[in-house]
Structures are given as C-alpha cells and as structure tokens.
C-alpha cells in the first residue's frame, strides 16, 4: 500500500467520546502502521507528499471488537424460538434434547465447506459495521474431529476475510449424548486428549467452559482450567448466567481474561475479578432473546472499577444477533449503560477481554491502522440508531476493506 494521510476527520482514538480530536489526521506508512496522529494543523511537513484521503469531517473510531461469539455451527434453532414464546424455558428445552445438543447434531453432520459458507454469511454483516477483530468459539462439536473442524473453519475465516480472528476452545460447552451420565469421563477426554491435541495443532488461542447447573461443575471447570494452564493457554468462563454458581471467583483465581454473562454475579465475585484484572463481558443480546429478568450488577461493576465489555454472543439458540451496533443499543436500553461505556465496551475493553489490548481497541502510533469511519453527527448515534447503516468505510492495516455504496 502507498503511505497515506487520512485527514479532515473527527478522531476518537481510545473509544471514549470525551477524548476526541477535531479536524484530525492519521498518517499510515506502507506497512499499515500508524506513524503519526493528531490535529491537521500540527501535521509535520514530512508527510506533505504522501497520498491523501479526505474524510470530510466523518467520525473515526478504532475498529470494533466482538469478543464473544459462537459464529461457526450448522443449522439454526428457529423451532425452539416458538417453544420459548410458548413459555418453555431454556433449561427445559435443553433437558428435552434441544438447545446446544441439537446444534451439535447439525454441526457434526456438516463438512468444513458448509460450515465455512454459513459462518461467512454471519461474519459479513459484522465486518460491514466496523468489526476488525472477533473471537470465535468452538463448542458445537464436542468430539475431537468436530471441534477440530470448527476451529479450522474459524482460522480459515481469519485467513480469507479482513478481520483478526481469535479462537477459543469450548469443548466443555455441554455434555455430548455419547457421554450421558458420565460428565467426569468427558472432562477426562477434554483434558487428556482434545485440548492437548488441538493446542499442538495450533488451533487454540484461549480456553472457555460453560460453568452452570446445566453445564459443568466448579470441580470440572477447574480441571479444564488446569489443563489449559499447563499448556500456557489463557482461560475465560461462561459464568453466573442462570444462577450464582461461584464460577467467577474460580475464573479470577486463574486470572481469566474474562467472565461472561454474569447476571447472577455477587459482590465477592466482582471483588475477585477486580483483583485479578478479569474483564466483565456482558451479553445483552442473549438477555433480550431469552427474556431474562435478572440484570447484571452494573452499578457494582462500576463501583469496583471492573472493565465492562459488550459482545454479540452470536449463537443459534440464545442470541442470533449479527450487529454489534444493536448490541450497544441494548447495552444502553436494557442494562442502563452510558454511551461512553458501550463504546469502550466494543473497543478498548473488548480487546482486553481477548488479551489483545496491545493490538486492538485503540488508535496509537506504532499500532496497525484498523479503524472505522462513521457517517454520524455524534458518537452517541452509534448506540442510538436501530438498523441504520452507519459505517461508511472500514480500514484494516491502512487498506480500505469495506466501503458502503451510497445511491
């Protein structure tokens, strides 16, 4: 690429609407790295002959980060939607053989090509909203071959689309049918065979567990965390979504990158997260879709200074959501979060939830130039509009990878 100065823009370099630069410029060298940013009036003369791109006063933020998704899977669960509307609970559907296990059947039956095509269709709307980094979990295979297949597809998405993909092994998502009544034996399989094999194949960036009364116990979760730690892999946790199981305190003991959901999180768990530097990832799409009533303890998280991230939690059963902007709106309207909180929640704090705060979530000299250009009058509009296409352009490594066609 040619060295380029992007100029006449309004810059929000760290995802906070109160920390902005009017009439700003960003200089990006031939490697795609930011070499200078600041007010246009202060642009050094050495950049005078670089290629220019005039953004005509548009807002620029760091590329968005979706830090919790289950993007790769087979089929849908639209039939369960009708059951939920009739009053059947998430837990009851799972006990009937639906829920996660029904998606496991569809995912096992699909080949890599089919999974890639389906996941690519889910990824593209996120890219068109300014997402430049995304986490993708496994967890719908629940055997070595199928988990490998999911993680390989996730890696392929990162190779073939202009987005940084981080993979999370979620083998401990549910109990596969062949292990019915033998949860400890399945944890043996995860710890002794699946996790080591997939780690050796370079398919895992982090390890997650669904710690819940319909998932895995604290003791089983700790076994998976121990296996991950032996491999030098960071951990994260689905925690306190349906009950206060104490998973967050366990996650904090292992210095987890994040604990996610957290509707039933108590103050002791919050204190443990703060001490460990664990990010709280809230998932308002799932809260909305399954009509939860227990709000996450937002005020306590604020009071203790725990960083809060937001994510789509895209999955077929509880959050078939393909919009991080709508997630921001739900964070404001359902969780009573502020605009600065939700914007940092999909930039700086989301990057921290992936352990990648040094690479994503902010625009600084020396970093890769990943940013989104917005056709809005104020940054509050990113969380205000519902369904309006707001992203004009997405730049990754200094190259425009998406441009919205107008007219």
Curated annotation (Swiss-Prot):
Q: Which leading EC class covers this enzyme?
A: hydrolase
Q: Where are the transmembrane segments?
A: none
Localization (cell)? Cytoplasm
Q: Catalytic activity annotated for this protein?
A: 4-imidazolone-5-propanoate + H2O = N-formimidoyl-L-glutamate
Tell me which residues bind N-formimidoyl-L-glutamate. Answer: 140, 315, 317
Pathway connected to this protein: Amino-acid degradation; L-histidine degradation into L-glutamate; N-formimidoyl-L-glutamate from L-histidine: step 3/3
Per the record, its GO cellular-component terms are: cytoplasm
Q: Which GO terms describe its biological process?
A: L-histidine catabolic process to glutamate and formamide; L-histidine catabolic process to glutamate and formate
Residues that coordinate or bind Fe(3+):
68, 70, 238, 313
Q: Which Pfam families match?
A: Amidohydro_1 (PF01979)
| Record's keyword terms, sorted | Cytoplasm, Histidine metabolism, Hydrolase, Iron, Metal-binding, Zinc
Report the main location listed first in the record.
cytoplasm
UniProt feature coiled coil, ranges: none
The entry's Zn(2+)-binding residues are 68, 70, 238, 313
Please tell me where 4-imidazolone-5-propanoate binds in this chain: 77, 140, 173, 241, 318
Concerning InterPro entries, the annotation shows:
Amidohydro-rel, HutI, Metal-dep_hydrolase_composite, Metal_Hydrolase
Cofactors required: Zn(2+); Fe(3+)
Q: GO terms for molecular function, please? A: imidazolonepropionase activity; iron ion binding; zinc ion binding
Q: What detail does the entry give on cofactor binding?
A: Binds 1 zinc or iron ion per subunit.
Q: Give EC number(s), comma-separated.
A: 3.5.2.7
Q: Write out the similarity annotation.
A: Belongs to the metallo-dependent hydrolases superfamily. HutI family.
Task: Give a short account of what the protein does.
Answer: Catalyzes the hydrolytic cleavage of the carbon-nitrogen bond in imidazolone-5-propanoate to yield N-formimidoyl-L-glutamate. It is the third step in the universal histidine degradation pathway.
Any idea what this protein is called? Imidazolonepropionase
Q: Which organism is it from?
A: Burkholderia multivorans (strain ATCC 17616 / 249)
Q: What does the organism's lineage look like at the top? A: Bacteria, Pseudomonadati, Pseudomonadota, Betaproteobacteria, Burkholderiales
Q: Which gene encodes it?
A: hutI
């Amino acid at each position: 690429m040619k060295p380029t100065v992007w100029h006449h823009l309004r810059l929000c370099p760290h995802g906070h609407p109160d920390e902005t630069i009017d009439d700003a410029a960003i200089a990006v060298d031939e490697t795609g790295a930011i070499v200078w940013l600041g007010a246009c009036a202060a642009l050094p003369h050495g950049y005078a002959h670089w290629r220019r791109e005039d953004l005509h006063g548009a807002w620029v933020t760091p590329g968005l980060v979706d830090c919790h998704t289950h993007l790769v899977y087979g089929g849908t669960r639209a039939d369960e939607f009708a059951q939920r509307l009739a009053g059947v609970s998430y837990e009851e559907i799972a006990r009937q053989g639906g829920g996660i296990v029904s998606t496991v059947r569809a995912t096992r039956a699909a080949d890599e090509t089919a999974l890639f095509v389906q996941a690519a269709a889910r990824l593209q709307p996120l890219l068109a909203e300014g997402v430049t980094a995304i986490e993708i979990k496994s967890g719908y295979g629940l055997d070595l071959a199928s988990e490998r297949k999911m993680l390989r597809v996730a890696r392929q998405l990162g190779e073939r689309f202009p987005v940084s993909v981080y993979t999370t092994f979620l083998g401990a998502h549910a109990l596969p049918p062949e292990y019915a009544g033998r949860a400890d034996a399945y944890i043996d399989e995860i710890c002794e065979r699946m996790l080591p094999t997939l780690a050796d194949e370079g398919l895992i960036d982090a390890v997650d567990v669904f710690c819940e009364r319909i998932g895995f116990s604290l003791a089983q979760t700790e076994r998976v965390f121990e296996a991950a730690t032996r491999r030098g892999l960071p951990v994260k946790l689905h925690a306190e979504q349906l009950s206060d199981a104490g998973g967050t305190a366990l996650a904090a003991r292992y210095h987890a990158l994040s604990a996610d959901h957290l509707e039933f999180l108590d103050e002791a768990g919050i204190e443990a997260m703060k001490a460990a530097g664990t990010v709280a990832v809230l998932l308002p799409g799932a809260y909305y879709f399954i009509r939860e009533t227990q709000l996450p303890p937002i005020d306590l998280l604020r009071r203790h200074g725990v960083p809060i991230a937001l994510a789509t939690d895209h999955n077929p059963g509880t959050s078939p959501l393909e919009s991080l902007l709508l997630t921001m709106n739900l964070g404001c309207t359902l969780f009573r979060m502020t605009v600065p909180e939700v914007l940092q929640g999909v930039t700086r704090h989301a990057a921290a939830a992936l352990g990648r705060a040094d690479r994503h979530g902010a625009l600084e000299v020396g970093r890769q130039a990943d940013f989104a250009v917005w056709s809005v009058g104020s940054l509050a509009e990113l969380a205000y509009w519902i369904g309006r296409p707001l992203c004009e352009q997405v730049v990754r490594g200094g190259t425009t990878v998406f441009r919205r066609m107008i007219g």
